[in-house]
């Protein structure tokens, strides 16, 4: 009788283990521990397709389900763990963090931006769940409202760390350490010398890119010339199209994707801020994708 009980118990445990592992491409890892990231999964199982997987970023910590992009050639490598995948065109989509929902009445485009009634930045923090990473990759799609000033605020408001660009700031940690900037200039073709257009629009640009930004930025405008206050321009920004030579920061290779290698490994959360220093201007986003590796 005792032997029969043991056999039944073994069968029951086996059935439960099989049920928990059904459809899991790395079930045998359960005998030891779950992988800590999508990169870890790919290292153990080359050829694993993109999809949702369970990982355990911290040993003996909680298990979380993440989306793994295993074939993202736009980031220059594989095995990326998604920390943000926002598409406001999908039904039921909501703006992350304290980004404000902005709906254009004419185009119907739903997007997430800064507070339309207050200057400054609105932000969203994306957790990395303890995953150690040295690379960040992602893409944004945004739109121009009114006449944003690109890096004009840095020239006009130096000394204010929260007011150096109209557009989007991606950073990590509390310092913060900047990862990438998506700047939004007033117009593609300025008619006179200006510091509120993109730095690479040509000899008429007389502004300054903050030294701590370096070359880790894109810049674009949603209107050719003469932007009007408060108008939502439905032409997507940072697509690499409609640029005018020598507008290299508008037509840079890889747009709208960026990829950045960090100097040191970190587990910091990543912050995305949409900023504007005047009303009525904004740079709302309808697509946000951020990955770490």
Model-inferred region functions:
Residues 2-293:
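Mature extracellular or lumenal effector domains of secreted proteins
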């Amino acid at each position: 009788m005792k032997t029969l009980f043991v056999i039944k118990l073994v069968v029951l445990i086996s059935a439960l283990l099989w049920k928990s592992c059904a459809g899991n491409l790395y079930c045998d890892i359960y005998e030891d521990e779950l992988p800590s990231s999508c990169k870890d999964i790919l290292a153990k199982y080359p050829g694993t397709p993109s999809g949702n997987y369970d990982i355990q970023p911290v040993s003996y910590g909680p298990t979380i389900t993440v989306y793994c992009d295993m074939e993202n050639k736009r980031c220059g490598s594989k095995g990326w763990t998604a920390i943000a995948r926002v598409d406001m065109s999908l039904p039921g989509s909501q703006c992350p963090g304290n980004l404000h929902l902005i709906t254009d009445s004419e185009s119907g485009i739903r997007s997430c931006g800064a507070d339309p009634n207050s200057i400054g930045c609105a932000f969203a923090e994306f957790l990395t769940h303890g995953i150690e990473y040295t690379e960040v990759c992602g893409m944004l799609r945004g739109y121009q409202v009114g006449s944003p000033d690109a890096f004009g605020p840095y020239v006009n408001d130096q000394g204010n760390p929260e007011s150096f660009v109209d557009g989007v700031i991606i950073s990590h940690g509390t310092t913060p350490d900047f990862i990438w900037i998506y700047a939004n200039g007033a117009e593609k073709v300025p008619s006179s010398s200006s510091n509120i257009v993109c730095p690479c629009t040509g000899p008429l640009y007389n502004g300054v890119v903050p030294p701590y930004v370096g070359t880790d930025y894109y810049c674009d405008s949603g209107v050719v010339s003469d932007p009007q206050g408060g108008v939502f321009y439905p032409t997507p920004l940072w697509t690499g199209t409609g640029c005018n030579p020598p507008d290299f920061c508008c037509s840079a290779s890889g747009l709208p994707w960026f990829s950045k290698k960090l100097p040191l490994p970190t587990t910091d959360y990543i912050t995305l801020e949409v900023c504007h220093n005047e009303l009525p201007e904004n740079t709302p986003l309808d697509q946000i994708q951020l990955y770490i590796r």
